[in-house]
């Protein structure tokens, strides 16, 4: 079985516009390996024709297995059996067990929801209750999370991404119909360069609104908009959050 993390989850999630059966899973695995997040050989699969909702529930039969084969080869073998991998286990020496999931929230939507979840540990402790050693560990874990966000958001075909403690990155339908769980929206959003001029517009809107949210150009691939930080007691900037959601609702 895939090794589970304990306690609350730190989640990095993203929406991708890509063919599920091609290389999304393998590309994500290769990217994670570059950050020393190693594939464990444990996967969960279901029938290729099955629908997997945003919560990971499949309309088909779920099957778990362990294989020493590389993930790409295992995926090919399962494909011959008309199956697809929907979860895979990874492990990082310091961050611990990690679970990579791929789901298709809406039938024939053309996009897929990818998330990587691992233990929040010290980031799950209220800021004011953290001890000195907790603060140091929390800072490392949050920086590690942001690096993962940058990595995933910068991947080809990423529409947008987000990260935070116990968060759910909303789908385009949830954004446009305002059916999001606002208490679980990302602490930081990642907007890829694929949004081009639109990305510049939203960052300018956030800055001109006087929002204290930090707009950071991480690199040529990703711009981050931080609504709140789990390292600070400063309240979430819901104005900046609303600008990001409004922007995504018009460009997707």
Residue ranges and their predicted role:
Residues 37-112:
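Short, intrinsically disordered low-complexity segments
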Residues 141-167:
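Acidic, metal/cofactor-coordinating or nucleic-acid-engaging core segments within structured domains
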């Amino acid at each position: 079985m895939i090794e589970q993390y304990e306690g609350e989850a730190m989640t990095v999630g993203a929406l991708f516009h890509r063919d599920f059966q091609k290389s999304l899973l393998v590309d994500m695995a290769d990217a994670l390996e570059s950050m020393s997040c190693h594939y464990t050989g444990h996967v969960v699969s279901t029938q290729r024709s099955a629908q997997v909702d945003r919560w990971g529930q499949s309309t088909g039969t779920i099957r778990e297995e362990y294989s020493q084969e590389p993930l790409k080869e295992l995926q090919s073998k399962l494909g011959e059996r008309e199956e697809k991998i929907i979860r895979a286990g990874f492990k990082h020496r310091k961050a611990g067990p990690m679970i990579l999931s791929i789901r298709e929230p809406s039938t024939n939507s053309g996009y897929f929801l990818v998330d990587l979840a691992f233990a929040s540990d010290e980031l799950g402790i209220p800021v004011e209750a953290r001890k000195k050693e907790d603060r140091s560990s929390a800072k490392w874990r949050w920086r590690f999370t942001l690096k993962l966000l940058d990595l995933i958001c910068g991947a080809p075909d990423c529409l947008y991404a987000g990260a935070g403690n116990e968060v759910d990155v909303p789908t385009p339908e949830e954004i446009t119909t305002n059916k999001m769980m606002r208490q679980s929206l990302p602490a930081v959003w990642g907007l890829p360069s694929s949004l081009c001029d639109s990305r510049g517009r939203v960052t300018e809107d956030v800055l001109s609104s006087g929002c204290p949210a930090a707009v950071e150009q991480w690199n040529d691939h990703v711009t981050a908009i931080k609504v709140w930080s789990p390292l600070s007691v400063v309240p979430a900037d819901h104005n900046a959050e609303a600008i990001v959601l409004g922007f995504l609702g018009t460009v997707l």
